[in-house]
């Protein structure tokens, strides 16, 4: 009898761990197979762009905004009504959501659920949900009605959480409802007017007059323009902040080797953040270090990409990842690479190189099916481009590729990242 009771208790324990009990922390919309409560529904998708949706800096504030502030549909990279076409290329559409949570359990899983009214399907279609920088991908079929994303322990955090949705390889997906499920103790809180998303010391120094300083990087996502009062030790700074997502460099005074500073940030008479930091000597940042080499590389053409080109150089080295068509070159949305071409001119390319391992393949494969050829998936998190330098990890081959170029030649270094 005792053995039976122990077995029953053990069985219940296993069930509770395999099928954890979730409660709804936040929900947007009703699960009624209808999108009528969302913005632009039922057929206003042509106003998606002019309504400001799709901008990765236009945030939806969970717990404050309503379904009427969130679009009923998310377009994929080939949706013409959202800016894509044969001539214009792909569009990069993202729907960012900001959620402020309290009593987050770092040892428990959470769930992001998406209920779907309709799918306008294309091959290899999937929806990505990025949670605080961690990507979760879920494939979509023509009859998919629900997507469940299991968020691992420790990904969601106390305070502000950034969740971004992006549709890949498809026309569109129409929402029925969206919800976050998790432990019962976790609660959603109001965002506030000036959320301080993060504070950290920069990994560089700036010139400040005749001295150098290591700036504090302050990231905010604000509803409206305003003023922050920043106190660093005894010094007070008043900083004007703009609407939307921005990163500000806050000077921290003359740097003397390693030193500790205490930072307190206030707005409208209320303290919103306090933290201590250790300053240390870093390299001086130059003006060219602010250049974003990826700017304009989505929905663009062959002449715009993250390659390390010399001005008026004969060699124009750049990663190529698009299938053959009139504007093919580099597209930021594509997460694999066909190789690195040395020529990018009007209707002309050439001398493509890519390091590989394993069996010999003579076809490149396609954007959607890289395994059909010698293409390699890449790690977008570590892809780096700055003036005169490009680096990417070819994850299918465990090779890091580094590129630079002179006026008439390229220099490439391939490093095996997994010697086994």
Task: Walk through the language-model features, giving the residues of each.
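Contiguous beta-strand segments within globular domains
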Residues: 91-96, 107-113, 203-218
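Short beta-strand/loop motifs in extracellular/secreted proteins, especially
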Residues: 108-110, 123-127, 224-228, 261
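Bacterial Sec-dependent N-terminal signal peptides
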Residues: 1-21
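Short, compositionally biased P/S/T/A/G/V-rich stretches that sit at domain boundaries
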Residues: 181-211
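Short, exposed coil/turn segments at beta-strand boundaries within extracellular/luminal domains
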Residues: 171-172, 268-274
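Beta-strand-rich ligand-recognition modules
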Residues: 22-107, 115-187, 241-253
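Accessory carbohydrate-recognition regions in carbohydrate-active enzymes
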Residues: 207-215, 221-225, 254-266, 275-420
